[in-house]
A protein has these predicted regions:
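Substrate-binding/gating loop at the entrance of the active-site cleft, primarily
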Residues: 32-49
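Short acidic, glycine/serine/threonine-rich loops at helix termini
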Residues: 11-14, 42-47, 90-93, 118-125, ...
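Active-site C-terminal subdomain of aminotransferase-like
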Residues: 124-204
Length: 204
């Protein structure tokens, strides 16, 4: 549980940077996003020194898959899809994006901060909602805001990973501090428990 969608996105991008450095030796990482991706990805790029490669959207305001394939290179650590994008409410082609990422052994983050708690129920109502989650083998992480259509209190979101191996790189630890072991799963060290508790209650 994070403080909001921006922190969920920042944590995910920091995770990919550290994963790529440790597992692939990438020192000059880049991420590929559509021009409609949330501004938090710009913030992550600046904070964590990740080059942000922006690709245009197509006539339906969805990430252009051909453009994405042209710019991905050996330093690409993650490609990003939005479900939906904030500017236009368009769902990027997650199935195609994630499969391309899987074939190229890079991460695929789905920003479902806006639609994460809408699209599953829209599908149940009969709307043609495509798969956007871990049912797709190439999706490696997701962000979804509980404080939007999850109706939790303002100030909560979640970031999810396909497995523990990737999630491990989100954590910050210091083992040689005279004060003892320090470990933090998010950016804040001390956090109020009330928001997490009310989020849990809303989910029930």
């Amino acid at each position: 549980v994070t403080s909001g969608g921006t922190e969920s996105i920042l944590l995910a991008m920091k995770t990919y940077r550290d994963w790529a450095r440790a597992e692939k030796g990438i020192r000059r990482p880049n991420m590929v996003v559509a021009e409609t991706a949330h501004a938090a990805f710009d913030k992550a790029a600046q904070y964590f020194k990740i080059k942000k490669i922006t690709v245009p959207v197509d006539s339906n305001f969805r990430l252009g898959l051909a453009s994405l394939k042209r710019v991905v290179n050996r330093n690409t650590i993650v490609v990003v899809g939005s479900t939906p994008s904030f500017p236009h409410g368009a769902i990027d082609p997650i199935a195609e994006i994630s499969e391309f990422a899987f074939q190229n052994k890079i991460g695929c983050h789905v920003d479902a901060c806006l639609g994460g708690f809408v699209l599953p129920w829209a599908r149940k109502l009969g709307y043609p909602v495509p798969d956007i989650d871990f049912r797709l083998r190439g999706v490696t992480s997701m962000s979804a805001d509980t404080h939007k259509y999850g109706y939790a209190a303002k100030g909560t979101s979640v970031v999810l990973y396909r497995g523990e191996q990737l999630r491990h790189f989100q954590y910050y630890t210091v083992g040689d501090w005279p004060g003892g072991l320090y470990l933090s799963p998010t950016f804040a060290g001390s956090r109020p428990g009330a928001l997490s508790a009310t989020c849990w209650a809303a989910m029930l």
